[in-house]
Each structure stands twice: as C-alpha cells, then as structure tokens.
Design a protein with these regions (language model features):
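Active-site anion/phosphate-binding pocket segments in diverse small-molecule metabolic enzymes
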Residues: 2-17, 21, 72, 91-93, ...
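Conserved PLP-enzyme active-site core in the AAT-like
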Residues: 30
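Active-site-proximal beta-alpha core segment in soluble small-molecule metabolic enzymes
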Residues: 4-7, 11-15, 19-22, 35-191, ...
Length: 368
C-alpha cells in the first residue's frame, strides 16, 4: 500500500538572514576598530543567493565585497552603486574598460597584469585603483617569488599605479598549529613593508580566528558568514544560516527482505514504512550520502535507505506509522540547526563549503 502527494513545493531552502547578520557582527567583534570586515560573496554567495545576502550585509555596515568572476562583480554593482567590489580573477586588455565602466577593483595576479595596468595608466586609459595578490605559499594565484622581487626592486617603474590593496591567501589557516601559517605571515609582512601606503589583507574566515596579527587592514570572511566552520578540528560558535526541507511525496510499506533503490544496496531486515522525498544528487545531495545520512522529522532521525538518486531519496519513516493514511503534507529536514552543513560534511569526508555551494537551483529559496 502507498500514498502519493504532489501539492506544494517539493523542497524549500530557507535562508536565515538574521543568522547571517549575527555571524557578520560576531566576526567584526573579533577585530580592532581600525580593521575592515569585508565579505566574500563569490559563487552566488556560496550558493544561497548574492542579492539578498549583499543587501543584508550592507544594512550591517559592510561596504567591501569580494567575488571571483567579473560577471559576479557586475551583478553586485547592479545591487549597489556605493559598495567597493574586488574581483579575484584579474584583468586583461579585453575587459579593462568594463572594470572602469562598473567601477570594479581588479585583483592582479601576475606581473604581466600589473605592467599592463601601468602601461594603460601612462596612456591615461585606466586611472583606477587595483589590488595586487602576492603568492606566499598557496602556489595558486598571485605574483610568484621572482615576480615579487622584480616588482619590489622596480617600484619606481610602476609609479603610475594606484595600489589600493596588497593581499595574499593562507593555505593552512584551517589548521591553527600548522607552521605554514607563520611562514606565510612572515613573508607577507616583508611584502607589506614595501607598500606601506596601501592597505593589506591576509585573513580569510579561519585567519580571523588565528590571531590579530593576521588581520592587517582588512579581513575577507566567506564560509563563516554562512554558518560553515572553516576549521578541521576546532569548534567555533556560528549561527546556522540554512535549513533545507524536503517533502515526502510517496509513502509505502515494504516487507522483510525487500530492497530499496538502484543496485539494491539496502535490504530490509524487518517490515518497514518508507517515504520518498523529492531531492537528490541533482540538487546537491551527494551520492556518498547513500545509506550514510539521516534526515529528521519532529526532532527524530530518519535513516536514508539505499542509494541517492538524481531526484529522489528514500527514508525510513517507521517511527511515524500514522503518515501512511494521512493526507497531510509532510516535510522532513535534510539540513537544519543540528544536522547542519558542518556535521553532515563529516559523513562523506568533505567540507561545509562543498555542501553549501552544491545546493541546486531547483529549491524554492525562502529568505527569513
């Protein structure tokens, strides 16, 4: 016997903007008054929606935002004409005019980009501020050792450039005792001394919690704003920002030895009542959660049975036999305050960043 329900939204992603605000304000409290707290809102604010996030943070006094792609920067500019926007992925001859048009600060990552800006300035084609990213150990983006040395030795050759910010990125800030943190700090301090008129930035979310000496003039939190713990083995107090609710769209009784899902990876050891919820790996619920996750209903954990499908997950609802003949629409919590992105990420040996940014576009997003 089974029941099938098809009304209302199949899955709802609730975003608590008040919790976001609390996280931002709590991060600011860890800083000296002279230190600016920017916000990293790349990847559509880590998947939860950059427009409401940016507007909420502006109300909290945030005036500086960081994104990865230029298209993201343009979107933010449409939300506000007054905020300062930095674009991590650099600048080139094809798009420099767009940086001027939208008043975006490019983060230059190579000596070639820096010299290009200098050349444009001499031609009076780019009279705008820039940021320079120096690689101090990440080996990903930024000027390498040779480029950094050349730039420092030849500062007089780039006198036309207005350097708003010098920055680097910590590779191991999520491990507070890793000696790499101190090594990068020392390298960055030496670089910063060569650009005293410019602001300096090193700390991401985890870097804020390391020590005030990592804060410099500007910090760039990302995941911590959204309730994600940036540390591997350290708990910090953050407010949960998201709640993911999925509707039970079908309920059925199965008997002992019946199997569930692709590959028949779950076999019932007893008669059970199972429900099917309308989310799957297409919505960002990783297949590694197959037989390896619980959702919750009325504060009771319900095990995931079998493999995660593209659009569906089957769960054990034997604790709620009254649901079988009920016409009530029932939602279960896939992610909530207790079963949050930090906790469930450990189940599949990943990080909260991946859980959050993977949440798909099919959810109805509700901002509260």
């Amino acid at each position: 016997m089974s029941n099938y329900y098809s009304k209302d939204d199949n899955a709802i992603l609730e975003i608590d903007l008040k919790a976001l605000s609390k996280n931002y304000k709590n991060l600011k409290k860890k800083l000296d008054k002279k230190v600016n707290c920017a916000a990293t809102v790349k990847a559509n604010a880590y998947g939860i929606g950059d427009k409401p996030v940016v507007k909420s943070l502006i109300k909290d006094g945030c005036k500086i935002f960081f994104v990865a792609h230029f298209s993201e920067a343009v979107r933010l500019r449409n939300y506000s004409k007054s905020i300062q926007i930095f674009c991590y992925h650099g600048i080139n001859l094809k798009n420099f005019k767009d940086f001027i048009r939208y008043n975006i600060v490019p983060v230059t990552n190579t000596l070639q980009q820096v010299l290009m800006i200098d050349s444009l300035n001499k031609q009076k084609k780019f009279n705008k501020k820039i940021a320079i990213h120096f690689d101090t150990g990440m080996s990903r983006l930024g000027l390498d050792k040779k480029e950094t040395k050349w730039l420092i030795d030849n500062k007089s050759k780039i006198s036309n450039i207005k350097i708003e910010l010098v920055m680097s990125h910590l590779a191991c800030a999520d491990q507070p005792n890793n000696p790499m943190n101190e090594k990068q700090l020392q390298k960055f301090n030496l670089i910063r001394q060569q650009f005293k008129k410019s602001k300096a930035s090193l700390a991401n979310s985890a870097g804020i919690f390391l020590n005030k000496k990592y804060h410099f003039d500007l910090v760039r939190p990302g995941i911590a704003l959204y309730g994600g713990n940036p540390f591997i083995n350290k708990n910090i107090k953050l407010h949960n920002v998201i709640r993911l609710k999925a509707k039970i769209i079908q309920i059925r009784q199965i008997q002992k030895n019946d199997t569930v899902g692709y590959g028949a990876t779950f076999r019932a050891k007893r008669d059970m009542l199972v429900g099917t919820i309308a989310v799957g790996y297409a919505d960002g619920i990783n297949r590694k959660f197959s037989n390896n996750m619980c959702v919750s209903l009325n504060n009771k954990d319900l095990k995931v049975l079998g493999r995660i499908s593209m659009d569906l997950i089957t769960i054990d609802i034997s604790l709620f036999p009254e649901l079988l003949n009920s016409k009530k629409i029932v939602y279960v919590d896939v992610i909530n305050k207790s079963n949050n992105i930090n906790n469930i990420s450990k189940n599949i040996n990943t990080i909260s960043y991946e859980i959050l940014t993977s949440l798909g576009n099919r959810y109805k997003r509700k901002y509260i």
